């Protein structure tokens, strides 16, 4: 069993809800698996043609950020997150203890 029941809600009562990007099911906002992806607006095949056609030496390709939100079942199905053993669940990826310590000071 997970320590936080798969949620990031502490002392908030109720969290808002979001819709899954894949299936459309309603999921609590703190339970949803969120990923932020930066994607180029121009695909790589046409980027070379654009680079030859432009007169500028340095051409910055426009990019856009996409925030994806998935329910737990869709995130497991799409292999965004995986089922982990009870010991492996204790490992927190992307967790920086120094950042938390500086926020409390």
From Swiss-Prot:
Keyword Membrane annotated: no
Annotated compartments: Cytoplasm
Entry-linked InterPro entries: Ribosomal_eS26, Ribosomal_eS26_sf
Any matching Pfam family: Ribosomal_S26e
Gene Ontology MF terms: mRNA binding; structural constituent of ribosome
GO cellular component, as recorded: cytosolic small ribosomal subunit
UniProt keyword annotation of Metal-binding present: no
Predominant cellular place of this UniProt entry's protein: cytoplasm
Keyword terms, alphabetized: Cytoplasm, Ribonucleoprotein, Ribosomal protein
Subunit structure: Component of the small ribosomal subunit.
Membership in a protein family: Belongs to the eukaryotic ribosomal protein eS26 family.
Protein name: Small ribosomal subunit protein eS26
